């Protein structure tokens, strides 16, 4: 038996054992990935760290399994498609590889074409690198040799003196060579079966079957996951349809529409002041809603039918085939994965294989031992003398020995060895055939069924994603159109409230503009008055009449006062803005974020949370455009609180949901709009009349003060907009009730307007006195002192300004007015004096008597107190004497303290003089220091500018350096990759040289050097025909094994065990070991200093990028990358890589023309031999055909089988005894040692007429064995011939042969 390894249909070599190309089987690799081929069972183990992306993994798998990258389909356990993130996170350790070509849709149509299946199986065999070849016949089994030996035997027996011409020397040489080749043939068979026959219970073929079925299970799980996706889509479609149908408004929208007809919205037109009424039913299109309802009914009916049809389609095309697929998989498991009950049978088979192999080894040893003493051809043709042609006695004896050896091997050893080899071959081929059978079933049936299921799932998914999804979307759109009828009261209410809020915003903005105008005007007025007063005082106190440039006329005075006093006044531009503002654009409603501060935030959030539906289309756009535009425009411009309140009351009256009514009321309150009872408040004027004060509440739009939230939001934004760098404005709101304050402010404003004329006539004299009361009078004014005086007077100035008055709070204004003139002030004071006098007189009249009684009681109390005081006086006099004495002592001490105080005062005066002197010195020193500080600041600015320039230069240099470092890193990586590829390429070149030598040696040629090599210069190569390569290889292998193992085995075991390595692995040519010396010219020490192994260059580059703003003083130093470059160049020169490369090329180079010429010449000889063998083969086929025809005409008499020609004769047993009274006697086959073969001649087709006949010649068509047991011993049908118990007999059906 021989096994040929075939790649791309070209025989690479002849091997005597199964060869399988496995990359790596080490499962202990870090993050090992086990990759399985789903159709061949092959396995590859690789480390996950060597793959940087999914494309690299696919390229590795494609090269390992000979599958194109675009045809790869990768699955993980449990049927999940492979993602590269699973490998990165080490979530998987197994990958199953499928070829997309076996899942092609075209395979479904060509499923009955066996040619296509055979092509796919042939590709699998090529991919698996296994091709079993049946054991070849022995070289001795040749008819030509048999005839020659018979003739030679006759010559040897009948002739005493044999001449050379009496013997065919060519045939004698052929006989000798055949005996030599026969031992090699037997050794090769034994070596083959020792390596191919497995003695373990788990063989590689069983592992392949298990891997194939496991891959099929993974594929079935993948189909299940795809089906679950389809099932989820189908269930989601049903749920969506059921939800739409349960909440459908097809039958309820009419009632809602009738309710809209009873809900009006009343408002007055601005131009004609005529009340208008708008019913909500005018905002929707009834005909369009009717069409939507009808369309929704039709789609619901069609969708119900469509989903029912899809369900039946899924059950028929997906669910049922999946169940059949699972049954088919279970059948494969029970058929090819042997259960544990077969363990005994499996053990028995292993024992049989061992027994057959042991017998084969014994007979091969006998054959090799018998062939060990074969004579040479010269010993067979030696003559008696040099001049004689008669063979010598020794030659005749050798020829007789040769013929005897031939007969012994040809008759006894070779047939038995060949039979044992065929038995082992059958056992081994059955294992491979089981896998091939499973592959055929998978390709012909299972994979095609899986492809059909996937195709059906894709088609059904397309229907669900397109037709069903589109219809459900249409139903949803129609339902949204119908939902507008129920949502319209809320939507319209929110819209009109928003228009009302816009109106309020305009009023609020107008109030803020007016207030800002007043403030700006007041500031201008106060500044002009201050300038006039200052100019007057300056001219009066500085002696302006003595200086010519201060002689100012009226025009110069006015220019000084009014220069740079520009008027900043805000004006309303409502008309211009309304003309230039673009028309509003309708945008679809979108969800509003909760963090958005906008007055429509609550509205949008409310609309989006009503029912969870997207914004419906504005149905109102389908109404007549002119009428709708006029109505909506008038409504937006003339909206009022009263109209909205009336609308809300109408909704409540018509029974609209209270949630809608409450939401509208909440929206109204959120806008700061009140619509409750209006509080009337009256105040009395100076003239005695009573008026009603509403404050700033314009038409119930709000109070526009601190209690109005909406107004305060806008007012705070306005005030906060004045913030700038270093200035923060904090707004504190007074929580007092502002209604009464507003009424009071209204009264003050009326009084202010009455007093304006009086104030203007007196030219604001009181104001000037008040503003200038804190200003120094007799100082020389200059711009610096003027600014200082302004700053010192700032609190006083701010006392009477509106912006800085402490009494002014937000929403309330109080102004303290000075008296208009002295007369009015005197008159007011006299009135207050008279009022106080009257009060004093009234108090005197009512309190005289009470005062008298009180005084009497006090006198009595005083008398009692005097008596007690007299007693105490005596005690005090004594005490006084003592105190006088102590007083004198204190007086003396006091004088001393006075003296000490005078001394301290003098010291204080001296200290004050010293402090004054030091202060003057400190002032001078401070000026000097200030000058130095100014100079240093200028210097600092210059240095900062220089620093910024240096930072920019440093940044640019760092960027360039980082780019260069990156380029050097890339060059390092390229060098590293180039070294690795050069090393790999060197190995491939050396392997090619080894393959060339092995190829030449396999055809009997040897590559040698004619001249010896010296001083790294190879000698001349030549190819010679050499005999004895087998023995030479055997010697080399034995020598290497003895070197490694230290012991030698017997020759027989050595020849049988290592013959494969001697033929395929051992190279006899001395050119290969000579070239191997120069194989490692790429010294790996050059790569010891790579980018990733030294000095942290990436960190250095990153550090430079992060600190690019600083001045890097290490730019002038030599970087670590530069050091590594120099070290790499030094290593390159020291290791002499160039010389090694040249030596490697010289000693690995083989001339192509030399090889081609010698191989072509050798193959010409082989082709000549092949033609001769083919001619012999044709002749043997013809002889075999003649012998077969001759054998078919001979009658068999033992070991009957179907197709044999048999002679049937009547038995001597009476018919009635055998057949129970039948008319016919039984017929039996003529035999020698094979009894009980009876003819079965049943009536019908093939019946033979046996009457009046003594014999019958027929060809056996069927043999049916029977056995007589105790149960059927008396049965006429089971034992018609009354044979003894336990006798085995046979029913033979035959066809009569007449010619």
Swiss-Prot record:
Subcellular location: Preautophagosomal structure membrane; Vacuole membrane
Membrane topology category: Peripheral membrane protein
Organism (species): Pichia angusta
Protein name: Autophagy-related protein 11
Residues forming coiled coils: 294-367, 820-962, 1164-1194
Assembly with partners or alone: Homodimer.
A single GO BP: autophagy of mitochondrion
A GO MF term: protein kinase binding
Lineage: Eukaryota, Fungi, Dikarya, Ascomycota, Saccharomycotina
Domain of life: Eukaryota
Family according to the record: Belongs to the ATG11 family.
This protein's encoding gene: ATG11
